[in-house]
Amino acid sequence: MSEPGKGDDCLELESSMAESRLRAPDLGVSRCLGKCQKNSPGARKHPFSGKSFYLDLPAGKNLQFLTGAIQQLGGVIEGFLSKEVSYIVSSRREVKAESSGKSHRGCPSPSPSEVRVETSAMVDPKGSHPRPSRKPVDSVPLSRGKELLQKAIRNQGSISGGGSGGSSSLLTNARSWGVRILHVDEMMMHVQQLSLASLCVKKQQPKKPEGTCPAAESRTRKVARLKAPFLKIEDESRKFRPFHHQFKSFPEISFLGPKDASPFEAPTTLGSMHHTRESKDGEPSPRSAAHTMPRRKKGYCECCQEAFEELHVHLQSAQHRSFALEAHLYAEVDRIIAQLSHSFADIPFQAGLPRWSGSPASDCDPLCPETLHPHQPSHPRAASPRIRKEDSCQASVTQGRAAGQQRWTESLDGVMGPPASHTCVSATTLLPALPKGSREQGCLCPCPASFTQSHLVTSLALLPGEWSPAEDMPLHPSQENSFAPADIPVKGPLLFPEARPWLMSARCWVRPFPFVTWGCLIPHDTTPLHEEVSPCPCLRLGYLYLLLTQSLWCRVRVPSLSTAGPIPRTSHPCTLAFPSYLNDHDLGHLCQAKPQGWNTPQPFLHCGFLAVDSG
């Protein structure tokens, strides 16, 4: 919204320009000024847009002024005369005489008709009615006398101009091409009017509010001081402008907090939370000493399905430990892991890996089975049953290699009864029970299963499935005292495809008791069933198929080495005597000696342990 004073000045300027149009030839500029109220601001600034001018002027101030003004108003200055030129500006007398003669006769201005102004929209500043627009008058054909007069005037002008025929020929060519010829005085007057009109338009434009021209402000403010905290990236080569960004707050790394706290968060102190308070008597109370508050790490246990305040306390709780010790809760996870394939190399057995019972490591290691009493609670680190199985496997192999080692075993009171007592069995007490020479011919593989002196526990085997027997399931031997998978009675649906340890005693398969957690990892190149099997190293040899009963017969069959024949039984029942090619007290060597063909899957029963009657 422009001020009223400025609007009146513009109206007076437009009316004066309309009056001057009657006295001077029109260049089409008045028409552009009349359209300024309708067209865009770009048309107001460049009224000569699309027009070209040829200046037939001597060097001087007029030439310099018109050159700059025409270019500023959108016109183009041509250096050579051609048919495409719109106007010729000349300072010759004949041009002035022609323009003055036409203006006195009331002839139309030499400006082209397509740019003629319409003054109907211009209002008189005194409030009078708008003037009717002037219609172009058709040019009346001149008589012969007038044409001769004009020709004489032209010739006189050419003579007075120094006798140069170049100027007369230039104007003659311009007239023949239809190019408009203007005098320099008229052009100067119209250019000044347009300059004043452009200034009036700029004053009428309202100022834009602050913040609408960020680009202009950024061009004006080239230098500024960055306020901390900020980040600025500069180019070393100075070819590109730097990038910078100012932050309201910037993170700081603090190493003063506890270990489990985030280094990007400042430690909270009690002193910062409490302010000095004045007591009722007016005396200020002493400020408490500031110390760092430990951050409690809260979380949610998906196993127990409850939230906890501290992870360490929750892992030691009875509820979480009882969940972690249940093997069947991890059965589905074990089944999925068993389906995965890996490219791990089979690490040979090393004597330095297992921890001996007399070593300092085993005395202080709570996971070592030799140092734990059966009634003693396990360590919180044994949260996963797989950890206990691996450690138990190493412990059982170590016991088989070292005579005189003691271990805890659980006994069975009857075939199906729960463990009734715990008996400490020494390997040295079992070896003398073997017949003479069998100690050199074979090796004793300790069984982590439960057995007592009154009940013969002969073998712990792995069946190709798991079922829930409601009663004892007798096994009937097939030909040559061997059992095939078809001879094994299956009762109920198969819960898991992998094998599970079962106890064979007196030709009956019974459900095992807590020793079922005695498992270890077997490489996939030796058994395709699953990765958790019994810790007996004999399974690492291949697919061993054996049967031990209370009777005097004992047949052992190795499918991959069937040509070797049956292993001869010893005179003592329920014992094994290995042939000469397997005669080695170190069962770890048996794990490494894999003959060709032992990795081939065989449809036989997978047995895990060899046991000896403790009586």
UniProtKB/Swiss-Prot annotation:
Description of post-translational modifications: Phosphorylated.
One GO molecular-function entry: zinc ion binding
Zinc finger (DBF4-type) residue numbers: 294-343
Keywords: Cell cycle, Metal-binding, Nucleus, Phosphoprotein, Zinc, Zinc-finger
GO BP annotations listed: positive regulation of cell population proliferation; positive regulation of G2/M transition of mitotic cell cycle; positive regulation of nuclear cell cycle DNA replication; regulation of cell cycle phase transition
Subunit details: Forms a complex with CDC7. Note that CDC7 forms distinct complex either with DBF4/DBF4A or DBF4B. Such complexes are stable upon replication stress.
Protein name: Protein DBF4 homolog B
Protein's gene: DBF4B
